[in-house]
């Protein structure tokens, strides 16, 4: 079970974007996530008339390692850790470590 999923609001805890918040839009693999507006890089693209693209400099979000982000707890307004709790019916749910509240599925 992944502790950070698509649709979660996360806060960057390390790197040049430290302190910024965003929403996970994609899990690249088991260890990287793509967060909207975080880790922006400038890509230089050539014009391609066959595809209808113009050349220039494009800003694009790149994946960031999941160890550099933490889930954002709206109740406390801070970053929080994620724990896994086993319910009586055998289902696993994600919970905030600080409060024990269940994390709503996005």
Curated annotation (Swiss-Prot):
Instruction: State the Gene Ontology BP annotations.
Output: translation
Q: Give the top-rank taxon of the lineage listed in the UniProt record for this protein.
A: Bacteria
Annotated GO MF terms: rRNA binding; structural constituent of ribosome
SUPFAM superfamilies under this entry?
A: Translation proteins SH3-like domain
List the keywords (alphabetical): Ribonucleoprotein, Ribosomal protein, RNA-binding, rRNA-binding
Query: What is a single Pfam family found in this protein's UniProt entry?
Result: KOW
Keyword tRNA processing: yes or no? no
SMART domains assigned to the protein according to its UniProt record, in alphabetical order: KOW
Q: Which InterPro entries match?
A: KOW (IPR005824), Rib_uL2_dom2 (IPR014722), Ribosomal_uL24 (IPR003256), Ribosomal_uL24_CS (IPR005825), Ribosomal_uL24_KOW (IPR041988), Translation_prot_SH3-like_sf (IPR008991)
An example GO CC term for this entry is: ribosome
- List the PROSITE patterns hit by this protein, alphabetically: RIBOSOMAL_L24 (PS01108)
Complex formation: Part of the 50S ribosomal subunit.
> What's this protein's function?
One of two assembly initiator proteins, it binds directly to the 5'-end of the 23S rRNA, where it nucleates assembly of the 50S subunit.
State the similarity comment. Belongs to the universal ribosomal protein uL24 family.
Which NCBIfam families does the UniProt entry name for this protein? rplX_bact (TIGR01079)
Q: What is this protein called?
A: Large ribosomal subunit protein uL24
Query: Which organism was this protein described from?
Result: Polaromonas sp. (strain JS666 / ATCC BAA-500)
